[in-house]
Amino acid sequence: MAKMQKKSINSPDETRTFDKGKFDLTKIGDTSIGKMYLEPGWSWEKCVKPLVKSQSCQASHTQYVISGRIRFKMNDGNEEEYGPGDLAYIPPGHKAWVVGNDPYTGIELGTMDLFHSI
């Protein structure tokens, strides 16, 4: 029988750093949760593409925005900007960048294992 668990997202199991950003990864039960920190000037094109070597991000994301703003552009040209309090589902085939001069902080739900290639 499964037991209840309690963990703090402020004490991650692992931290992944890369140019202008980091992901704090926490596993609880069979779910991965991540807290993302992206600096102004971060973009998928400049900071992640060189690491994963694909034309766009091939992972899906479910995110909750804590602070800052981020814009996603799908391969088909569709774009959407997200800010504090927004929930976002982003399917594979996109690029993203931080909008403005404020850092972006968000919670990534359930898909953080995909970031182990970073």
Regions found by a protein language model. Give the residues of each.
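Conserved short histidine dyad/triad with adjacent acidic residue
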Residues: 35-56, 79
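Conserved GNAT-family N-acetyltransferase fold
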Residues: 36-38, 63, 88
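A short, N-terminal "cap"/entry segment at the start of jelly-roll beta-barrel domains
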Residues: 1-37, 45
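Ligand-binding loop in jelly-roll beta-barrel domains
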Residues: 91-117
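Short acidic-glycine-tyrosine-enriched beta hairpin
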Residues: 74-93
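Short beta-strand segments in beta-sandwich/barrel cores
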Residues: 43-44, 68-73, 96
